[in-house]
């Protein structure tokens, strides 16, 4: 596996560097984080570069650049301080619809290309069904030629502003043998109530509770095939976990570089603190973790481009990178001392964001379970 970037990939990365140097994005990110506001202006700038077309097939007007290119772009964005967690639907969200959606649904989502606006997200988690997705209670029932959606979802990302969501629900007419199906829901429909929740980190992307009270749908609003709900989201879950891991690496690399520059400049006891062995030890451990993350992610991206990536690979990336990145940021914060925990240094935002990522997108514990099963399955 050769992970040297080709000319096209180098151009993308160079474009990212140019964009990030074009203005004081950090001040904008800090404001959006403080106010829990989606950074639409920044996402629009990325969309203008074609980032939202990276994985779209050429026959649909996309670049079909592949996952290694995506990884290189994501890592560089994160290294330069961008909140890449707000972009999870940007590269893969269109492909989900190209794979599962009707032409009408595809047209509605593809209209968001190049806009930078939030377009859709999945609504699966419920108050009583987090990791145990088989315990979903939200139902769809058929009455008089219509579909009626009832129940509630919680911790649903992007749902404060997104115009559409894809809701996982069970057939209310089949209580003994659950049938799970996804539905494409226009958020402007009557009977939908959205309550925004406050959270520790990842504050630039909304997190909401959504209730459905006899929300009326049509058969054409079915997303994918009836009864195929869990199968259709499996690839989406794996894709999300890979993107979370890429975000973790980029954020950790940014914190590492901030701390390294500080260690070489901060003078105590007559010399730069970077000359002290205990500080050097921290950087040695951070560098080992960062290098391990990077190699793991590029291998996973290569597998994705060659059609060999598995759910176990995605779980390994998600678990290792979420934990290693948090440890790197925590160590970097220790190096920064009071500067890192007081005032407005971005490392405090990184610390909060990475702590959330050990829960969101699949908890640490669920990644370990998924990976353990995948490993043992190879030896049956």
Curated annotation (Swiss-Prot):
CDD domains to which the protein is assigned, alphabetical: ACAD
Disulfide bonds: none
Cellular compartment(s): Cytoplasm
SUPFAM superfamilies listed in its UniProt record: Acyl-CoA dehydrogenase C-terminal domain-like (SSF47203), Acyl-CoA dehydrogenase NM domain-like (SSF56645)
Cofactor (UniProt): FAD
UniProt pathway: Amine and polyamine metabolism; carnitine metabolism
GO biological process: one example: carnitine metabolic process
Molecular-function GO term, any one: acyl-CoA dehydrogenase activity
Keywords assigned by UniProt, alphabetized: Cytoplasm, FAD, Flavoprotein, Oxidoreductase
Main location: cytoplasm
Reactions catalysed, as given in the entry: 4-(trimethylamino)butanoyl-CoA + oxidized [electron-transfer flavoprotein] + H(+) = crotonobetainyl-CoA + reduced [electron-transfer flavoprotein]
Keyword RNA-binding in annotation: no
GO cellular component: cytoplasm
EC number: 1.3.8.13
Family statement drawn from the similarity comment of this UniProt entry: Belongs to the acyl-CoA dehydrogenase family.
Subunit note: Homotetramer.
Function: Catalyzes the reduction of crotonobetainyl-CoA to gamma-butyrobetainyl-CoA.
Protein known as: Crotonobetainyl-CoA reductase
Organism annotation: Shigella flexneri serotype 5b (strain 8401)
Gene, per the UniProt record: caiA
């Amino acid at each position: 596996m050769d992970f040297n970037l080709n000319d096209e990939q180098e151009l993308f990365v160079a474009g990212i560097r140019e964009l990030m140097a074009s203005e004081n994005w950090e001040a904008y990110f800090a404001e959006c984080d403080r106010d829990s506001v989606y950074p639409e202006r920044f996402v629009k700038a990325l969309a203008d570069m074609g980032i939202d077309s990276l994985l779209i097939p050429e026959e649909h007007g996309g670049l079909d650049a592949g996952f290694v290119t995506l990884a290189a772009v994501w890592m560089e964005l994160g290294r330069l301080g961008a909140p890449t967690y707000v972009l999870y639907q940007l590269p893969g969200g269109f492909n989900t619809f190209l794979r599962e959606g009707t032409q009408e649904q595809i047209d509605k989502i593809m209209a968001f290309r190049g806009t930078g606006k939030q377009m859709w997200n999945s609504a699966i988690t419920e108050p009583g069904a987090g990791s145990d997705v088989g315990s979903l209670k939200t139902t769809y029932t058929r009455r008089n030629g219509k579909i009626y959606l009832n129940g509630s979802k919680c911790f649903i990302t992007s749902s404060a502003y997104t115009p559409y969501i894809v809701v996982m629900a069970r057939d209310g007419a089949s209580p003994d043998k659950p049938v799970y199906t996804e539905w494409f829901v226009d958020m402007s429909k009557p009977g939908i109530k959205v309550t925004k929740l406050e959270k520790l980190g990842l504050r630039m992307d909304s997190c909401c509770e959504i209730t459905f009270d006899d929300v009326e749908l049509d058969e054409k609003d079915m997303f994918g095939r009836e009864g195929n709900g869990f199968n259709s989201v499996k690839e989406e879950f794996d894709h999300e976990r890979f993107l979370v891991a890429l975000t973790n690496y980029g954020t950790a690399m940014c914190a590492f570089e901030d701390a390294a520059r500080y260690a070489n400049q901060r003078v105590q006891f007559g010399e730069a603190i970077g000359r002290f062995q205990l500080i050097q030890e921290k950087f040695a451990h951070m560098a080992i973790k960062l290098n391990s993350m990077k190699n793991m992610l590029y291998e996973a991206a290569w597998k994705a481009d060659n059609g060999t990536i598995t759910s176990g690979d995605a779980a390994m990336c998600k678990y290792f990178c979420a934990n290693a990145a948090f440890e790197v940021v925590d160590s970097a914060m220790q190096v920064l001392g009071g500067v890192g925990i007081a005032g407005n240094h971005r490392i405090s935002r990184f610390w909060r964001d990475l702590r959330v990522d050990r829960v969101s997108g699949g908890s640490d514990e669920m990644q370990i379970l998924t990976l353990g099963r995948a490993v043992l399955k190879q030896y049956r």
